[in-house]
Amino acid sequence: MKFLLFCCLFGTFLATGMCIDCEHCVVWGQNCTGWKETCGENEDTCVTYQTEVIRPPLSITFTAKTCGTSDTCHLDYVEANPHTELTLRAKRACCTGDECQTLPPPVLEPQVNRPNGLQCPGCIGLTSTECNEYLVSCQGSENQCLTIILKKPDFSLSEMSFKGCASENLCLLFEKKFWRFLEASEVDVKCTPAVPQTSQ
């Protein structure tokens, strides 16, 4: 259960100062309807995203809508790979006003696993800020090594750690500090360039 919670948090890309109202929801599957909520003063767009967690032969998809910032709208596809057999990826789309009623939801294209010759240390710690690292082969657009440490969590979360390959778009999103849903927690994020795989 905690692993699924981690994946949800990972995929919640909450994405300057007029106030707008955006629909908020998170559901398993591809159709998401919820309630309207006034966004923060620095949030000027609504964001819909579809996130997929893949661990062959299983795949879990969920869709969410929330507030965001328009300076992250171009970061519309992100992916990460903390384990050789586990992939996390998300597609995002922005909208405002009536456009949100007609904009088609973002759709993830079928996953094609293509190693790109890079590697990073990878691991997931569901209840700790530390985890046992091992080398992970990066795929597709993953050219960064991402480390996320969740400290001082609120009552609904435990400490967590995540290390693995990631796309540059995901690192740029974290630079924008999009995690409004973790305001009560301390989150340390670091990205470094992935390194070429060494021959065995």
Curated annotation (Swiss-Prot):
Keyword NADP belongs to the record: no
Gene3D superfamilies cross-referenced by the UniProt entry: CD59
Main location: secreted
GO molecular function list: phospholipase A2 inhibitor activity
Name this protein carries in UniProt: Phospholipase A2 inhibitor gamma subunit B
Subunit structure: Heterodimer of subunit A and subunit B.
Modification after translation, per record: N-glycosylated.
Superkingdom of the organism of origin: Eukaryota
